[in-house]
From Swiss-Prot:
InterPro entries: Acetoacetate_decarboxylase, Acetoacetate_decarboxylase_bac, ADC_dom_sf. The keyword Protease does not apply. HAMAP family: ADC. This is Acetoacetate decarboxylase.
């Protein structure tokens, strides 16, 4: 391979890259979202400045993605924390777990999604929508919601899916010193809502040292939604460079 061609490659291994080029379009992406109130002091310890908390809330989200351009079929879950940045409201992505190596690789390399490997599932059990996460062999999350009990306004569903996502991008140099340390923002685009519902929900978080979702305890369930949508991942943008701060 010519030297001039090396920088044109997307990632390694060159003969079989870990992921293809985007854009990444999701068809029939299915969400189970549960918003809950948690401990404010716990949130203050983990949400990085210059983001500001927008209440003492967390959104647990479970997403089944059966048809993703270039990445195939997989399931993902995690915690998102409502925040504000320069008066723009969005969500800080705290941690994410999924069962697809290309999606993990592209999320971490090409963007800043805090992704780790886990075993999430979203399924219907009798008349309940269930989201479950295992890390290794151990259960970490069980989320339940009544299956399509009440319709949710489609505009409200769109608003939930269209919120900006904030993430940290941290890469060390070969000397162990920070090489990249940035706050990133990305938004979903080309959103089509196919259906949306709400209803009663419950959420159990189990302590795990390497999947510490339970460090943000469930104090009160605020709301829940079940949304079917198509969308495209937007291009991430740097909104704050921590290494430029003196």
């Amino acid at each position: 391979m010519l030297e001039s061609e090396v920088s044109k490659q997307i990632t390694t291994p060159l003969a079989a890259p870990a992921f293809p080029r985007g854009p990444y379009r999701f068809h029939n992406r299915e969400y189970l979202n549960i918003i809950y109130r948690t401990d404010l002091d716990a949130l203050r310890k983990i949400v990085p400045e210059p983001l500001e908390l927008d209440g003492a809330y967390v959104r647990f989200e479970m997403m089944a993605m059966p048809d993703t351009t270039g990445l195939g079929s997989y399931t993902e879950c995690g915690q998102a924390i409502p925040v504000k940045y320069n008066e723009v409201k969005g969500d800080y992505l705290h941690m994410m777990y999924l069962d697809n190596e290309p999606a993990i690789a592209v999320g971490r390399e090409s963007s800043a999604y805090p992704k780790k490997f886990g075993y999430p599932k979203l399924f219907v059990d009798s008349d309940a929508l269930v989201g479950a996460l295992k890390y290794g062999a151990l259960p970490v999350v069980t989320a339940t919601m009544g299956y399509k009990h009440e319709p949710l306004d489609l505009k409200e569903a769109y608003t939930q899916i269209a919120r900006p996502n904030f993430m940290l991008k941290i890469i060390q140099g070969y000397d162990g010193k920070p090489r990249i340390c940035e706050l990133i923002c990305a938004e979903n685009t080309d959103i089509t809502i196919h259906g949306a519902w709400t209803g009663s929900a419950r959420l159990q978080l189990f302590s795990h040292a390497l999947a510490p979702l339970a460090d943000l305890p469930v104090l009160e369930i605020v709301s829940a939604s079940h949304i079917l949508t198509d969308l495209t991942l937007g291009t991430p943008k740097v909104v704050h460079d921590y290494l430029s701060v003196k």
